[in-house]
Amino acid sequence: MDYKGLAILLAVIGSAALAFGAQYQNDAVGDQQGKTTKTAGSLSLKQVLGLLRRPKWLAGTGMIVVALVFQITALSLAPLIVVQPVGAIALVITSLLNARVSKTKLNRLTMLAIGLCVVGIGSFVAVASTIAHEIILTDDLLWDVLAIMAVILVVFGILLFKQGSQLKAIYFITGAGVIYGFVATLTKVIIQRILQGHFEWLTVLCAAMLIVGVALGGWFVQNAYASGPPDLVIAGLTVIDPMVAVLIAATILGEAQQANPLTILGFLAFAATAVTGVLLLSQFHPQILLQKRRAALWAKRKRL
């Protein structure tokens, strides 16, 4: 029986929970940071740990956990390349919610950027749902995923701890998106191996890598909240995350073996559309423009 429709519905519900969770966490990070301007990479370890004492941040975390439950359930019912991109719906919800909360009027370029993200990812899902299929996961395939993820975690871990205070929002968002793309893949892998009756030490290793990925990705996300609006953060996660997950699913896990050259071109075009939306959002969102003006004014005052 085909459960793709149900899986997409569950992913949509999870996206709504993710949007509200992101807004709550973003507000809590702003309160914790005590900032008048947003500076990239400005969260210290003490500030991150301080979030654990903030009810608003905990409420946001709870909503994100609910979103993950729906996402994991959806992943158990349909291929990764169908489920993961549906999260782009969270971008629309987050943008409207943040505009209302922050009393920010979205400009035309921001609306265009959101539209590009949603159309790009929506088209991606439509194509993926027609050619995606489950495969039997071998140990060799799993080792490939783990090896690549280990390199990714080391690279981004070094980048965060060496250059964190100098990074802009788009870099934190990209890092979080790439890491969570692997986290989504490992989640799907663990579900598959349990269903296939292969729960052994390699599966436990996957779970350990998943936990490390969630922790490091979470650090990137909190710093992204400290340096950009929540809809930009969600845009990065709901575009970069699924793109990475789908790339892994298609090239390593073989979920897109039925794709012909025309389909692949479509994937690339839709991916480019969505990524363009994220880049536009990172440059022209009203809150980003306001941050740039404040930063320029602050720099001017320091020179006087």
Which ranges hold each PLM region?
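Polytopic alpha-helical membrane proteins, predominantly small-molecule transporters/carriers
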Residues: M1-L304
